Amino acid sequence: MYINMKDYGLTGINKTKDTRAIQRALNRGRCKPTTVYIPKGTYDICKPLTIYGNTTLLLDNETILRRCHSGPLLKNGHRFGFYRGYNGHSHIHIKGGKFDMNGVSYPYNNTAMCIGHAEDIQLIGVTIKNVVSGHAIDACGINGLYIKSCSFEGFIDYSGERFYSEAIQLDIQVPGAFPKFGTTDGTITKNVVIEDCYFGPSELPEMGSWNRAIGSHAS
């Protein structure tokens, strides 16, 4: 199934309606392989979006999804969902666009993309920016992670306690490592390729670079 978000009521005018429209399209991935295309524009997101298995999310290179809440922008599971091993929502491909955590206007510690208990996760040509204290990507318990030609721009730690935070965290499903969802069953992250990526500040003067590009807390 191919969905153009223009046909789902996406306007860039009302953040509540836009968030609902994108989530409604992503929900189609529960039933069948789905490609969701988000055209050029800036869309304010008022709650975390959940992406399901066998979904390709295509964004125009001038598309911005801008956080207007305190949580993550995108995750592949629900807080009380039962995920273990690599049996979570998998085969998720994200291509293009900008995911703006909007950390100056919403200065809350969180991670842009939280991906856990899954296989075959791909990000190509994606920009993640303006993160407060957290990670651009938290990949925990993933078998097959491919990140290519992505940009990680802009990090600040208002608390002064998260100097160690990485842009890309590769972790193991152990207690405290991945609090968003899933079981802490020791599932490792493996078969990872990260290539041709940029790590640096964003255009905002407050937003510098992460102190570490790639790392892990649990290991």
Where are these regions (language model features)?
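Right-handed parallel beta-helix/beta-solenoid
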Residues: 1-24
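Right-handed parallel beta-helix
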Residues: 60-63, 90-101, 119-130, 143-156, ...
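Amphipathic, non-transmembrane alpha-helical secondary structure
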Residues: 23, 27-30, 148, 195
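Flexible, charged surface loops at secondary-structure boundaries
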Residues: 26-32, 50-52, 86-88, 116
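Extracellular beta-strand solenoid repeats
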Residues: 37, 44, 50, 58, ...
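Extracellular beta-strand/beta-solenoid scaffold signature
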Residues: 22, 46, 68-85, 105-114, ...
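N-terminal extracellular ligand-recognition/capping segment immediately after the signal peptide
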Residues: 9, 19, 31-73, 77-79, ...
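Short glycine-/Asp-/Thr-/Trp-enriched loop segments that recur within the blades
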Residues: 16, 159-160
